[in-house]
Amino acid sequence: MPFVVVSLSLHASILEHMDALSQHYPGQSGVYILEKGEESLLTRAWLTESAQKTIDVQYFIWSTDNIGTLASEALLSAAERGVRVRVIVDDLLIDADPETLLSLDAHPNIQIKIYNPLHSVGRGTLSQLWHLITDFRDANQRMHDKVVIYDQTIAITGGRNMADEYYDYDHTYNFRDRDVMVAGSVLPRIQEGFNSFWQHPLSVSLTELLAEEKRDLTTEQVGSYTEWLHRYASDPLNFAPEIRIAITNMATRVEQIFTQLHWTEVDYLHDIPGKNKQRNNLGGGGQTTASLIELLSRAEKEVLIESPYLIMPEGGYDFFSGLLSKGVKVAIVTNSLASTDNLQAYSGYHKQKQKLLDLGISIYEFKPNPGIHRQLIDRYEQLGKTSPIFALHAKSLVIDGQITYIGTFNFDPRSANLNTEVGVVIDDSKIAHQVAQAIRRDMQPENSWDASVDIDQQGVGFLKRLQVDLWSLLPLDPIL
């Protein structure tokens, strides 16, 4: 079906845009792949500015760096114009202080909840250690979801958290990642997934976690922080020059994105809060794991996988051996030792790599200085800057040139058994071709080493290799 062009206005609601489009595609969902970090960031910014009723946010990481701070201000501005904002953030890596969190939560249109708060918010060091010792499994069960829903009409999900390095704005280290924007018939299921977390006891309100700090928080402190936040966002020095230009042109770019939505069949996968919490061990899987296994088991010709971490969980070898024995080609691109941000996870992969290669899986290891950076962030060359190094962070899967998964699931035991995960499954050859082309490009020699022939640990110093060897001695595989 040809694209339907709808004229957009910054002052019209997202809901109006999508109503005008979706009536032409009953029962289908619009899909747009967000490959570039800058485009994904600016699309989020525009949608946040345009939302009129609700914004629901679910993240594993929300940093206090430049991007995280600007995003917080954007949500505050939305709340100030009457938008209801609900935020769920996993507790593990929160680095904001209680006053900052409570000052945002103090706005009547903003509610913040913390998922499984056993580590950071409202916990002292002794409490953290106690929970880690006495409740090891629950302390390791994290919400890895990354979803933003605007006016219950448009959603973005994928690999990106809210921090500089996920949007190509860290000056030294960035992630090669992938998101997808969806609209249409899949939205009720995405909203249902968010609501299941929002209503669950594992998601605890800030006012409950920080009751004492809230009592001590003054109106002046709240006002001082919100004023500072608005000043920060309005200061052009806090935006790179290229971002200021991009923001100016964003209305035109978003109009192009909306007209390029591809309408097709889309499903949404999400785990329940706590995942397999009823189990007593570190295994057992979840709904996302089971769905991906079922999709993979139907493969007949080819499976392409992109995952920053590659550690086979229990049963993984036999499963992929079965695929390969029936003639399915399996190719995976993951991080090299030179590019990885997680030495513990790499140590698990390092122990398994030869066995995976012996099975017949083609493995490619992403380079820290891939040629693809020129396509992803060409502004560095334009501005005469030195490009930062890259690590792979995209989590995608293409089966038989027809089925595509884009989401948060890493191919490791932690995603399979511990962390809650989400993602969309798209049954469409055009989208599959687009994502497969991107994955194959990441596998090219200018972007990745062939793990079967290239020198292992190429260009990596002794200390980093030693760290991997030491991590490999520990029995950590179930939680990697």
Positions of the model-derived regions?
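Sec-dependent signal peptide recognition
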Residues: 1-2
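Charged, low-complexity intrinsically disordered terminal segments
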Residues: 5-146, 150-480
